Amino acid sequence: MTVFQYDSTFEGLLTALFDAYYRRTFPDLLLAEKEPLPLFHEEVHQVVTDAEKTERVWKLLSRKLSRRALASLTYCWLSETPEAAMLLFRYMRKVTDAPASIEQNFADPDVLGVYQLSKKVADERMRVLQFMRFQKTADQVYFGIMEPLYNVYPLTIHHFRDRFADQPWIIYDARRHYGYYYDLKEVSEITFEDSRAAFLRHGKLEDELLDKNEKLFQEGWKSYFHSVCIQSRLNPVKHKKDMPVRFWRYLTEKD
């Protein structure tokens, strides 16, 4: 068994693909740098992430894949699932070797796997856009927090920056303990020192942190939500399918 160890970054994965072709040795397993090696292995290659190699591989993939298929690579990577790295490696190798495009060849298990995984991430991104609820803080920053299944926040920045260009905001991922802050000029990545703070657990800011009118707006939104609800048309099963229960604690109207 041939093992490649890399730094668990997307750039490291692209470098691993470059190294495999250069060495004419392809890994049976990709591991993070500190992961224990399997008992039965024949060769271990330490991948050193290299910007030049990464750029060359990405340019090659850009020539052989459509923009949509190229984006699916990023979506798959952001799934952070255990199988994503090896799945992407096999897929990119097939793309490199194929004389024509393979992105529509869903009979291939790796092509199908990349499509299905990227779709799951895309669906989760859309849920974040749909269900993000902002709370206005006392310092006039709009704060939104969620706990998405996948690491989709990097895929939402453009939307929030465009949609709320005239308002400072923070979106925070409670699962991965990081977020983004927009100061009306730039978007920067942030973290909170106390990852166990109460508002990170239940998704609601304490009253003393809120703008003086925030509670009034929240009550108004709840009243509107309940007033437009037609009791005779309630369908709890469909409601939970369209609005998964795992998001409810972050929704003002479900408080």
Model regions: which residues?
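Charged, alpha-helical interface segments at or near domain boundaries
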Residues: 31-129
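Acidic, Ser/Thr-rich peripheral helices and adjacent loops at domain boundaries
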Residues: 45-53, 186-200
